[in-house]
């Protein structure tokens, strides 16, 4: 279970400023 991966997927659905810090895109 990769928390960062889940967050990145959620960001694709609902973008969030925090996503940019955690995820490459």
UniProtKB/Swiss-Prot annotation:
Transmembrane segments: none annotated. Coiled coil: none annotated. Keywords: Antibiotic, Antimicrobial, Disulfide bond, Fungicide, Membrane, Secreted, Target cell membrane, Target membrane. It comes from Panurgus calcaratus (Solitary bee). GO terms for biological process: defense response to fungus; defense response to Gram-negative bacterium; defense response to Gram-positive bacterium; disruption of plasma membrane integrity in another organism; killing of cells of another organism. This is Panurgine R. Antimicrobial peptide active against Gram-positive bacteria M.luteus (MIC=0.8 uM) and B.subtilis (MIC=1.5 uM). Less active against Gram-negative bacteria E.coli (MIC=32.5 uM) and yeast C.albicans (MIC=18.7 uM). Not active against S.aureus and P.aeruginosa. Has no hemolytic activity against human erythrocytes. Probably acts by disrupting membranes of target cells. It is found in: Target cell membrane; Secreted. Disulfide bonds join 8-23, 11-19. One of its GO terms (cellular component) is other organism cell membrane.
């Amino acid at each position: 279970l990769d928390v960062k991966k889940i967050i990145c997927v959620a960001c694709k659905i609902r973008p969030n400023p925090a996503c940019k810090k955690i995820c490459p895109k």
